[in-house]
Amino acid sequence: MNDLCTDIGFMSVNKFGEQLCGDHVEVIDQSDDSHVVVLADGLGSGVKASILSTLTSTIISTMVANGMSLESCVDTIAATLPICEVRKVAYSTFTIVRTIDNREAEIIQYDNPKLILLRDGKSFDYPQTETKIDGKTIYKTKIDLHENDFLVFTSDGAIWAGVGTTMNFGWQREEIVEFLEKMVRPDFTAKTVSSLLLDECCRLYGGKPGDDTTVCTVKIRRRKSVNLLFGPPRDPKDVNKMMTLFFAKEGKHIVSGGTTSTLAGEFLGKPVETQLDYLDPDIPPIAKIEGVDLETEGVITMSRVLEYA
């Protein structure tokens, strides 16, 4: 394990009037330091596109999870996916990003918009190797990663944003790069970058997306230690032991749950000061305990955290 980690964030918006998204993102954690991210875009929109993109990303992720090489996954998918008889294009396109030890990345791209790598705030022109598999053109890349690198990749809904309305020919890759170089800061999370770009796509579409649009961002950042204490020990005799171990840990300390907060306050000899400000009426307010970086309610708050994640 090194001092870097991989931050992954993605967001999607459905084509206007559709209930299902024709894009699908699958993430596999091979270890704490190695991850595989697959973004698949099914042809068209609606149920058919959703099934095709889910099938594509699931096949790739399942093969990777079982130790198959990325090349074998690509061979299988490229040979399996049919070509639309009318449009003469694949029924599903995909982008695969695999990070290894948070220090290098393997990128495989098939018919999705070309991945954008932001390094030091500027677009980095990375090398690509072109390969033909069953008549399909696959682009492969293997590069070293640096701290605060952002790998941003999208479905083709992004480059069609605003076509025929706010933009004559859609939002071209060069314009997306210019937008990202202008807006992205090193302290942004992967989810923030994805949200920022997707919001701009929706704005260009006039709030009525003409295609399913997905943005996925992979960021390499330095690790930050956060310790979360949620719930009291089963045996009340273990309270002091648990609190001693918890507060001895390096990094931020978060305590969740009313009973747990009371125990933490007693251990520290500090009162629990409940705040009355509600940022969300559905979420109980936080409290303050001297020596604790953040104190929250338990189950409801943690459920919302998982929802946002």
Question: Where do the language-model regions lie?
Answer:
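Catalytic core of PPM/PP2C metal-dependent serine/threonine phosphatase domains
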Residues: 21, 52-121, 138, 190-218
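Conserved beta-strand-loop-short alpha-helix elements that form
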Residues: 33-45, 109, 144-167, 218, ...
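Short active-site oxyanion
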Residues: 104, 248-253
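C-terminal catalytic subdomain
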Residues: 160-244, 248-250, 270-309
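Regulatory cytosolic signal-relay segments
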Residues: 1-20
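Acidic loop->beta-strand submotif enriched in PP2C/PPM serine/threonine phosphatases
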Residues: 18-31, 125-163
